[in-house]
Amino acid sequence: LYGRADEIMKLALIRLPYIQEALSLDAMNAIEEYAVWGGVPRYWELRENQNSLNDALWHNILSVNGTLYEEPIKLFQDDVKDIVKTSTIMSYIGTGANRLSEIAARCNEPATNLSRPLKKLIDLGFLAKDVPFGIDEKNAKKSLYKIADPFMAFYYQFVVPNRSFIELGRRLPIEQALTAHFSEYVSMQWEKLCRDAVTGNLVNGVVYGKAKRWWGSVINEDKKPEQVEFDVMAESLDKKYLLVGECKWTTQENGKQLTTELLRKANLLPFAKKYTIVPMLFLKNAPKDEAGNTM
């Protein structure tokens, strides 16, 4: 009232462990559910009213009568002026256009025109700007734009591309899309959860700073350029250790093989030579063998 406030509260998303308790889930199902609903209690409540994740998807999201079918548009109405352009940008990013140049090409307009709407979406928490570990966040050349909110990410990957099928009540093409791509989608959310789990936490007796991804070109053992990527990379607060991680949301993996490859890639990084390298595997299932550092 009168533009005055005693306190302003910015409510963050509720974290993963609580959805397991709220919906009485095992760890694996909790991660899959969180990949869809994120940390919004209202979405959890809607999920709780259905018998299964599949039932909840069809009842709430994948139906024209679903409570959440138009959810992103409703959220944008409160905070953005050009809802159509905003949703279009989110659609392109959700379906794989992650570089500024790619988004601009899909939008058919100069990249400079997108700076303001992209920043707005980041400020609202819908997008995140992803840059490799150790790179200044202002480095536009290396930046990738990703949808930050799990529900929004699911919506723009599975709902928007299939909207015509949803509106015609055609379940089969949507079921095929979910069967083909849902596990891959969860794996991307799993990576983010793993980075969050490392950030600021004690891992094997060492506290680490902000965990990020790293990708780029290195010179390999054969003196040839090689593109490498790390799902998780974090520096210890005492700057002695560099944690490098591989995330897998698949069936049993060969832990020793993954660890060996992690160390091989890490030893190719010039900036890593000043650290003690700590390899870490983040696996959906226990590895086939004893792999050392696994979570």
Locations of the language-model features?
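Core-facing hydrophobic residues within beta-strands of well-ordered domains
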Residues: A5-D6, T276
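Conserved beta-strand scaffold positions in the cores of enzyme catalytic domains, especially
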Residues: D6-K10, T294
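Interdomain hinge/linker elements that couple catalytic modules in large macromolecular machines
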Residues: K10-Q157
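A cross-kingdom feature that marks ATP-driven nucleic-acid transaction machinery
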Residues: S143-M295
